[in-house]
Structures are given as C-alpha cells and as structure tokens.
Amino acid sequence: MMAAAVVRAEVRRQRREERKKMAAARTTEDPPENHVVADVACGTGAVTRSSSSSLVVSSSSASGSDEPSSASPLSFPVCSPSTAVRSPGSAGVSTSLCSVERMVELSAQSPAADFSVSEAWRFEEAVNMALVACEAVSPYDRFRLIETPDENFLLVTNVIPRESAEVPVLDSSSSGGDSGPEDKKKNVGNKTAGEKNGGGSRAKRRRRRRAPKNDAATPSFLRRHDVLERFAAAAEPLPSLCVRDYALRNADRVTYDGELIYGSYLLYRKAHVELSLSSNKVQHVEAVLRQVYTPGLLDHHNVCDVEALLWLLYCGPRSFCARDTCFGREKNGCPFPALLPKLFYEPVRDYMTYMNLAELYVFVWYRGYEFPAPTPQATTAGSGGGGGAGACAVETSASAGRVDDAGDEVHLPLKPVSLDRLREVLQAVRGRFSGREVPAWPASSRTCLLCALYSQNRLCLDLARDEARTVSYSPIVIQDCAAAVTDVTLSHILPGQSTVSLFPVYHVGKLLDALSLNDAGLITLNL
C-alpha cells in the first residue's frame, strides 16, 4: 500500500511539473520521431500515445486485436507527443519498450555543449513512466530486462497468459455405444429443438456446460458403473511393504524354461578392466581433482576434502577384495581392488553424481572401521619433522601392495594423506548418512572383477537348477573381450525367437593369464 501511494504521489508530481513545462514550450518544435518511444501492451490492455501528450492504457478486445477501445483509459503524462511504436505480435505480453537510439546519437555529438540537459531529462522520464506503466498493469510480477540488437531494452512481464480453460461436462447423450433407445430419442428431440430455434451449436454448448440432474439414474451410467465395479473386483491388492531389502522380486523361480530374473547388465570394456585391477590410479585421480574444486560443481553437504575421500575409495584399507581366496593373492601377493561402477573408471561428466556415489561407497565400506593408532616409531618421526602424532602421514611406499599381519588391510596410497584428514572425512560421511535409509545393498559387496566373474559362473552352473525364488544379480559383460567367453551359457527360449544368452560364462583362468603387472602398479590385459 505504501509503495502504491508513493507511485501515485510521484505521478501527480510529474504531472504538475509537466504541465508547467509544456505550457512554456508550446511554441517550440517537436523533437524527432525516434526521440523517446514508450509502448506497453498486454493481454487485457494496450498503451498508446494520445494527442494530449499522455500515455494512455486502454483495454483491447479479447481476441488480441491491436486496435484499442475507448473504455476506461488511464492517462500518464509524458514529455513529448509522438506516435507509439507497437511491436508485431505483442498481444498477450506486458512489455515496455524505450528507445535509446536518440540518446546515443546525442551523447556522441561534438562539442559536448550541444547536448541539451532537457534531452537527458526527457529520456529519464520516459524510462520512469515505462516502469510506472508496467507496475500499474501487473503490480505483483517481476520484470525481466532484455536488451535488443537495435540498442533498445525491453521490460517483459506476464509472459504466460492467464486463461481458464473450460472443461465440458459430458452427459448421457455423449456416452457413445452405451446409449439406449430412450437416450437416442432425447438426443433427436434436443437436436430438432435447437435447429428450429436457429441455434443448434449454441444449444450443444449449453448442454455440455450443464450437467444433467439425474445422471446417476440413467441406464448408461449404471452400465458404466457395473463395468468399473468388475474391474475393481478383479484387481489384486498391493503387497504390504514390510522389509526394505532393495532386492528385485519380479519372478518366482529360476529355470531354463521358466522366468529368469536378472538386473541391468553391467557393461565394462577392456580399459575399465585394466584400471579396475590396477593399484596405481594416480592419473585418474589427478584428473578428477583438477576440476572438482570448481565453484558450483558440488553441493554444500558434500565432503570438502575430496583427495582424502578418493584415497579411501581407491586405495584405502577397505577398498580391496574381501575374499580370502581372491585371485590377486595368487597372482600378485595381494588382493585386487574392489570393483566399482563404470563411471568411476571414466572421465567424470557429472561431478555431483560421482561424489555422492563415492561418499556412499566409503560410508558402507568403512562402517565401524577405525584407523589404528600410530606406532611409536611413526610418532617419533612425526614429532621430529614438526608434526604431532595425529598429523603423521599414511604409508606411501612405491612398492605398495603389501598385506599386513591382520590380513584384511592393504595400503596402496596415491599420495601421503594424514590420518587426521582421513578421520575427518569418515566423520563427515558418517554424519551425512547415519540414521538415514540409504541403498546400502548395491555398495555392500567388496569383490574384485575376477571374483565377481567367478561368482557369476557359479550362479549359472550351480544355482540355476535349484529352483531359487529370487536371484538379485546383475550380469557382468565385458564388451571387447570375446576371447574369454566360453560356450557354456545360461539361456532360455523366448516365444517365437531364438536362444537368448542371459548370463555369459567367462574363462577366469584365461583372463588371469592375460594380466601383466608393471613396476608402476599398472595392469595390462593382453587379449
């Protein structure tokens, strides 16, 4: 209310000043046509310039015609009379267009003394009056300032028209094939009456708008109600959600000739296999750290220390295969790194998704884990270097790949990371996910690629014949390693189609023999 009162007072003051100035300047010559132009158009009104040097807001026709009517004009005085410029197709949009071409021309003239002060005042007044007109048309809307190529600016509001669509009410006459003989007679009688009155179309529109009072008693309505009752009786109630185990339960059994449940295929390529089995992921992590700290990529709840988070994900003590019989222990003397989704082995496209999944895996893998206290030797070395016991760095030897005495911790660090940083990251991740229901089932497995393929082979050969009710497993498919695929597959016959292979069986021994490890910790797959 106060803002509206201030605007009205300002308009009245400008009117009084304008009357005085126009009375003194009646004999002066009018400015050029492109001096100052203000135009406002909307779905319910249009702004034009009248002969009395005022900005007139008048209502237009409902059909969007450009010709303004003479009903209830609202006048706003302006400094100079000129012809309003209407942009084509502007009906339905509230706009305010103020030309600044004349302003630019006058400011570029030399000498500067020729530039009249009244010209600048008139331009400023035109801009103010355009704002007042827009606020008068739509006082509660926000404006968007758009600069046009011809050095104009456009104030736009009410871009979306506010029209209420009228939904016709269907009566018994529009029920289609369910209408009986009585309904047909009623329709014929209504049509004849409408034609006699010369307003058949108007009678139809009135019938659509007016719902019949006895709609529930018509035979067609009763028949439709019976059909809906039969559909409702045949529907089965939804099962109660008692346990959230995030498992797929869309099949009853696993057989060769029945239904086989499987998740989406996990597609990997040769490059993904090499990076997933390699203990040295320095180049990949450095590429991630190069862009991850760009403002706007991450949210406020993400972990701040991304380097420590990636250390825990790629080379922390819980980032390796948890099987006691891992193939990596026989091949290299230490287990292979745990298998992650494919996006962790590719250039990052969505940093938000990447970081959220990384935090989820770290939370699940390190649940209940605490880093051991530093040894006295490490404490002495840390204090001698100027750091305390909590600031000592995790071991970073080039010959990493060594299993400790406990048998479940492997240290393959990327770069030296202090224990304090790791503890802070774990605390931040636990604070984010603790006490919340998170899909921990997909991330709970700490299995390398070769052990996962071995389990997939066992599933195909052993578990398929046991009539298992549910198999929640996503088959792994290596796309460009066809030489390692055997002829043994679990398949079933689809009706009218050929045999479809669902779970491919891979030759794990051939894949293991094709791996070669260099001194830098990189693995190459020679297939």
Swiss-Prot record:
Disulfide bonds: none annotated. Keywords: Early protein, Host nucleus. Residues 202-211 have a biased composition (Basic residues). It comes from the Viruses. The keyword Mitochondrion does not apply. InterPro entries: Herpes_UL95. Residues 9-33 have a biased composition (Basic and acidic residues). Belongs to the herpesviridae UL95 family. Participates in the expression of late viral mRNAs. Expressed before viral DNA replication, UL95 assembles at the viral pre-replication complexes (pre-RCs) containing the early viral protein UL44. This is Protein UL95. The lineage of its organism: Viruses, Duplodnaviria, Heunggongvirae, Peploviricota, Herviviricetes. The gene is UL95.
